[in-house]
């Protein structure tokens, strides 16, 4: 079975959303993990907007990338530029496929009336990315 790591800055939003969709779309074809180069509490808005789409991430935990240093990953997917630039080299080898896609950080929105809209926009972008990835996955 293949191992996939989704990496972000804080493992609080974008990587959690991607982990949820990848698990759903791959349906047991791979082990999917998410982590952050720093770890923060999972963003409640991420949990809420995923629940709207029928994906429950409320039981996910926020993990630091160092927790996975002994796992050989087949894919490392970075979902923000900061994680891409700071991802430790020991998480990949010559067989690891690295994929980078910088998604907008909805938690950076401070205007409360636009927060849910920003999270939904981010969710839909990540959902499409994960769906497309799952269709090419082998």
Predicted regions and their residues:
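Conserved active-site segments centered on acidic
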Residues: 1-68
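Glycine-rich, flexible loop/turn motifs
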Residues: 38, 61, 83, 99, ...
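Residue-level detector of flexible, active-site-proximal loop/helix-junction positions
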Residues: 39-41, 83, 105-107
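Glycine-rich nucleotide phosphate-binding loop and flanking beta-alpha elements
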Residues: 57, 83-86
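Short glycine-rich anion-binding loops that position phosphate/pyrophosphate groups of nucleotides
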Residues: 12, 81-84
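Local beta-strand N-terminus motif with an aromatic residue
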Residues: 73-74
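Structural signal for conserved beta-strand scaffold positions within catalytic alpha/beta enzyme cores
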Residues: 34, 78, 99-102
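Phosphate-binding/catalytic loops
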Residues: 86-138
């Amino acid at each position: 079975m293949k191992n996939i790591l989704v990496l972000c800055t804080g493992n609080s939003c974008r990587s959690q959303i991607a982990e949820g969709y990848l698990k759903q779309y791959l349906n047991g074809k791979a082990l999917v993990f998410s982590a952050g180069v720093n770890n923060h509490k999972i963003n409640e808005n991420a949990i809420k907007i995923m629940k709207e789409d029928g994906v429950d991430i409320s039981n996910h935990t926020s993990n630091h990338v160092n927790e996975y240093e002994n796992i050989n990953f087949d894919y490392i997917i970075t979902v923000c530029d900061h994680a891409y630039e700071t991802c430790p080299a020991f998480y990949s080898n010559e067989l690891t496929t690295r994929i980078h896609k910088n998604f907008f950080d909805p938690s950076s929105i401070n205007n409360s009336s636009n927060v849910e809209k920003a999270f939904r926009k981010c969710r839909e972008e990540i959902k499409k990315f994960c769906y497309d990835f799952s269709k090419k996955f082998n």
